[in-house]
């Protein structure tokens, strides 16, 4: 992939982030860690998507040395229903581990304000932009 990006003169080093999804079990931890280090060494980064869902857990963070997590929209939506205790626990653990958090699926100003108050610095969701196809990005 890196060779292809270089061949196409597509300089995304430092800007291109890959996501480890909740449906992707890791069967070879050593190879996964080597690949993550390789990507990081070339300026590309891997983030855990939908953290605390499916296969994505604290075990991935410990074993792979990842630095970013995306909190799934299911947890963000709890803000609107006064059920955010699990979200608070996840954010607290991430902050203690010095992980960057991306709040995924932020749709309201109230969610944004509350998350910002809780120390979240990165956001994704309809409040900011609807999804775009590649040529529009």
Predicted features and spans:
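Short, flexible, glycine/charge-rich loop motifs used to bind or transfer phosphoryl groups or to couple energy/partner
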Residues: 6-9, 34, 58-60
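Helix C-cap/alpha-to-beta connector motif
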Residues: 3-15, 42, 97
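EAL-family c-di-GMP phosphodiesterase catalytic domain
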Residues: 15, 19-27, 44-137
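Charged helix-capping and loop-helix junction motifs
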Residues: 1-4, 31-34, 82-89
């Amino acid at each position: 992939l890196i060779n292809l990006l270089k061949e196409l003169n597509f300089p995304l080093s430092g800007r291109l982030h890959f996501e480890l999804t909740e449906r992707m079990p890791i069967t070879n931890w050593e190879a996964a860690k080597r690949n993550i280090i390789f990507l990081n060494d070339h300026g590309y980064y891997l983030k855990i998507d939908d953290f605390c869902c499916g296969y994505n857990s604290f075990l991935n963070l410990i074993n792979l040395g990842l630095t970013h997590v995306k909190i799934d929209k299911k947890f963000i939506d709890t803000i609107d229903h006064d059920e955010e205790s699990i979200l608070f626990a996840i954010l607290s653990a991430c902050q203690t581990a010095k992980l960057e958090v991306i709040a995924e699926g932020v749709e309201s100003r109230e969610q944004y304000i509350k998350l910002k108050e809780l120390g979240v610095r990165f956001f994704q969701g309809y409040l900011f932009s609807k999804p775009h196809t590649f040529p529009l990005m």
